[in-house]
């Protein structure tokens, strides 16, 4: 039985931490290492961690300074001893068969990543989200959790997280993608429970946080590390598509209702940034609805609507409508 390391960054989650840890300790899979990283949490999370560590149930790493979610994960990854690693956010929780399901899938193929769906928990209301088998499950399904990784693959390719306060999973997923991992998708499993914590960084984003700036910075840093001139054309087009998807999400999901003046600024930034990074984006074959059958319907429609209005010169009107809804 291969060892699996579960990595849990901890910051300001005392209300939910025991639920998370108990779900990890209640697994049907036995060979588990649990590494918790206290990222200078200002609440009583450390007292809870001490309780579990004294019982010999977890190992605790304490950061000397606040590193953020991604770098805390990376620090634990470098100290892990498992054959496989999984990331768990400390306000989330997992089903009892979670690790066993992923480990069984890993066992049946020489995979670098096994990917599953998740169950979104918003105020006790649960909705399952499933993933389809395709390259897009690695690239644009950007949640770092709900996946199992071969530890040696991550270390061999120096795949890690960047020090941003939001969107670190976008960079991590793109870095995985360009190294062409062998992957498998469990299309009918959603044993990761993603709890919508309104106090978390992503849960508290609003129009004033300028998420489009975060997205731009993440792609700048990715392109700096992996220059587009060195990319295979198909990889380049998919990275370009992923940029557009994330920018549309920044404008529509996090920017709706922000007012016309704010949206004008956001949209003009998006288009200028798109031209600077991917000046030939209109030639991208993946921007056509029919090419993206294995992408989620929501994403396909969002990109197709954007491209249609862009083509006929009415894209600004579309986003101004979103600005006041």
Language-model segments: residues:
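Short, well-formed alpha-helical segments that are part of the catalytic scaffolds
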Residues: 12-26
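A conserved acidic beta->alpha catalytic loop
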Residues: 23, 38-47, 65, 89
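Glycine-rich, basic loop-to-helix element that forms the pyrophosphate-binding segment
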Residues: 63-80
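Short aromatic/hydrophobic "clamp" motif used to bind/position activated sugar donors
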Residues: 85
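Conserved donor NDP-sugar-binding/catalytic core segment of glycosyltransferases
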Residues: 97-127
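Conserved nucleotide-sugar donor-binding catalytic segment
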Residues: 134-209
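Catalytic core of nucleotide-sugar-dependent glycosyltransferases
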Residues: 190-197, 204-233, 241-278
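Membrane-interface aromatic/basic loop that binds lipid-linked glycans or pyrophosphate carriers
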Residues: 256-325
């Amino acid at each position: 039985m291969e060892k699996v390391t579960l990595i849990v960054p901890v910051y300001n989650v005392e209300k939910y931490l025991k639920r998370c840890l108990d779900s990890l300790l209640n697994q049907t899979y036995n060979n588990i290492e649990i590494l918790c990283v206290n990222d200078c949490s200002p609440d009583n999370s450390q007292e809870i961690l001490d309780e579990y560590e004294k019982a010999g149930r977890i190992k605790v790493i304490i950061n000397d300074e606040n590193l953020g979610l991604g770098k805390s994960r990376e620090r634990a990854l470098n100290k892990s001893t498992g054959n496989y690693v999984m990331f768990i956010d400390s306000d989330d929780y997992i089903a009892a068969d979670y690790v066993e399901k992923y480990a069984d899938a890993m066992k049946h193929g020489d995979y670098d990543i096994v990917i599953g769906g998740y169950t979104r928990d918003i105020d006790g209301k649960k909705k399952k989200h499933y993933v389809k088998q395709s390259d897009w499950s690695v690239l644009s399904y950007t949640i770092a959790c709900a996946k199992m990784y071969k530890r040696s693959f991550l270390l061999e390719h120096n795949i890690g997280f960047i020090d941003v306060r939001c969107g670190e999973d976008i960079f991590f997923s793109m870095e995985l993608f360009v190294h062409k991992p062998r992957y498998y998708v469990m299309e009918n499993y959603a044993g990761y429970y993603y709890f919508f914590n309104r106090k978390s960084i992503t849960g508290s984003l609003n129009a004033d946080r300028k998420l489009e700036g975060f997205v731009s910075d993440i792609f700048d840093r990715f392109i700096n590390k992996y220059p587009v001139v060195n990319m295979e054309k198909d990889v380049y087009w998919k990275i370009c598509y992923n940029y557009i998807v994330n920018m549309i999400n920044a404008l529509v999901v996090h920017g709706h209702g922000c007012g016309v003046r704010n949206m004008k600024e956001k949209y003009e930034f998006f288009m200028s940034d798109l031209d600077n990074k991917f000046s030939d984006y209109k030639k991208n074959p993946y921007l056509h609805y029919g090419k993206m059958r294995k992408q989620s319907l929501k994403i396909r429609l969002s990109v197709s609507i954007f491209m249609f209005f862009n083509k006929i010169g009415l894209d600004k009107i579309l986003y101004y409508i979103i600005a006041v809804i």
